[in-house]
C-alpha cells in the first residue's frame, strides 16, 4: 500500500514597506488523485494604510479551485488601529457559489505589554442563515 507524500516550498521577500511570498505544495495520497496548491500573497504599506492581498489555487484530478483575501489596516485611528478584510471561506470551483467572510477589528494598546482587539465577523452561508460573531483578543508581550 502506498503512503501519503507531501512536498512543499515557499519563497518570500520582505522590505521596509512591502513584501511578497509564493508557495507551492504537492500532495500525493497514494491513489490516482494528486493535489497541487499554489499561493501568492503580499502586502504594501502606504503612508495612511497598509493593504494585504492573497490568492490560492488548488488542482485535484482536473478540478480547479481558487480562493482569495484582501485586507486593509489603518494604523493611526485614535490610539489604535482599524482593520477590515474579506475573503473566500475556502477554495471554490468556478461553477460553485462563492461564500465570503467579512471582518472588522480595532486594536487598542492598553500599555507597552498588552493590547486588546475587539472584532466582528460575518460568514455567509448557503442556507441564507449567515453566521455573525464577536471576538475579543488580548495579546501580551514580555
Predicted regions and their residues:
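CBM-like carbohydrate-recognition segments
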Residues: 103, 107-109
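Detector for outer-membrane/organellar transmembrane beta-barrel domains
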Residues: 8-101
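Loop/turn elements at helix/coil->beta-strand transitions in domains of secreted/extracellular proteins
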Residues: 80, 113-114
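Outer-membrane beta-barrel "beta-signal"
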Residues: 108, 114, 120, 130-142
Amino acid at each position: 500500500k502506498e503512503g501519503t507524500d507531501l512536498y512543499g516550498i515557499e519563497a518570500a521577500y520582505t522590505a521596509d514597506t512591502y513584501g511578497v511570498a509564493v508557495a507551492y505544495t504537492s500532495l500525493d495520497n497514494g491513489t490516482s488523485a494528486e493535489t497541487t496548491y499554489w499561493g501568492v500573497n503580499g502586502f504594501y504599506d502606504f503612508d495612511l494604510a497598509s493593504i494585504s492581498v492573497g490568492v490560492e489555487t488548488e488542482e485535484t484530478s482536473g478540478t480547479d479551485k481558487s480562493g482569495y483575501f484582501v485586507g486593509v489596516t489603518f494604523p493611526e485611528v485614535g490610539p489604535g488601529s482599524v482593520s477590515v478584510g474579506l475573503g473566500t471561506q475556502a477554495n471554490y470551483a468556478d461553477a460553485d457559489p462563492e461564500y465570503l467572510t467579512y471582518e472588522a477589528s480595532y486594536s487598542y494598546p492598553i500599555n507597552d505589554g498588552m493590547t486588546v482587539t475587539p472584532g466582528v465577523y460575518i460568514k455567509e452561508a448557503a442556507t441564507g442563515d449567515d453566521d455573525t460573531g464577536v471576538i475579543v483578543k488580548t495579546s501580551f508581550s514580555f
